[in-house]
A protein has these predicted regions:
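Substrate-binding pocket helix/loop in short-chain dehydrogenase/reductase
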Residues: 40-41, 48-50
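C-terminal beta-strand-loop-alpha-helix "lid" module of Rossmann-like NAD(P)-dependent dehydrogenases
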Residues: 119-172
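Conserved NAD(P)H cofactor-binding loop of Rossmann-fold oxidoreductase domains
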Residues: 32-37
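Residue(s) in the substrate-gating loop at a strand-loop-helix junction
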Residues: 89
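The beta1-alpha1 cofactor-binding region of Rossmann-like NAD(H)/NADP(H)-dependent oxidoreductases
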Residues: 1-12, 46
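Active-site loop immediately N-terminal to the catalytic Tyr-X3-Lys motif
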Residues: 42, 94-100
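Active-site helix of classical SDR
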Residues: 64, 105
């Protein structure tokens, strides 16, 4: 276990893995570390945005860069090139109110993944994105919702933010178990041919419709659902 924002710790983990695999190529690297921050543009701090980006994007960069040789950039290693699997989110394609920091990190991860996927054709290292919808993990429970909403007692967004936080709880209840993501990741590593991106989302149809509607209509639908009313 190591902190993906600590570049030294990431490099130390490479040594541990190298001792295990010897001169073989590493079959796969799964970048799953992530966290979520909720709040309005008025209240979120630059530090919160930075921490969100450091974990969800720079952490992935550190790991991808550090493990490249083991995955196949070192041509002296034996075996087939490995695969990089980056766990993104449907929040990497649909921006939601009060999740701008999280959206930023996941949109960034999607662009990073697409860029290096094309670069790493040089070594035959495939890069695949898994984009989950709601998953039964405590990613949003780490936010003390009562305290967070209390911060907005005198804000126009108080009621809307409270509703958004309740929605995250409901989404977790209908979410897939984490094992579904783990099984997909293992399947990708074991398969010769894969798609570049897999969306695993129990609310798939709802999100597809949001993307099909004109942006202004989707904006109004989301605003109504979250009680974001101009005052």
């Amino acid at each position: 276990i190591f902190d993906v924002t600590d570049e030294t710790a990431v490099k130390e983990s490479v040594k541990v893995v190298e001792n295990q695999i010897g001169d073989q190529k590493l079959s796969g690297l799964i970048n799953n570390a992530g966290l979520g921050v909720m709040g309005t543009i008025q209240s979120l701090s630059a530090e919160q945005f930075k921490y969100q980006f450091d974990v969800n994007v720079l952490g992935v960069f550190h790991c991808c860069q550090a493990y490249l040789d083991l995955l196949g950039a070192d041509k002296n290693r034996k075996g087939d090139p490995g695969k990089i699997i980056n766990i993104s989110s449907v929040s990497g394609e649909i921006g939601m109110p009060f999740m701008s920091a999280y959206n930023m990190s996941k949109f960034g991860l999607e662009g990073f993944s697409e860029g290096i996927r094309r670069e790493l054709l040089m070594y035959g290292i495939d890069v695949v994105v898994i984009a989950p919808g709601p998953i039964k993990t405590p990613i949003w429970k780490k936010i003390n919702q009562k305290d967070e909403v209390k911060r907005y007692d005198n804000s126009d967004f108080r009621e809307s933010l409270a509703r958004a936080m309740k929605m995250t709880d409901k989404m977790e209840q209908v979410g897939f178990e984490p094992i579904v993501i783990a099984e997909r990741a293992l399947s990708i590593i074991e398969s010769k041919k894969n798609n570049t991106r897999y969306r695993i989302d129990p609310t798939r149809m709802q999100n597809i419709l949001l993307q099909l509607f004109p942006k202004r209509i989707a904006d109004r639908m989301i605003a109504k659902r979250m009680n974001i009313i101009r005052k």
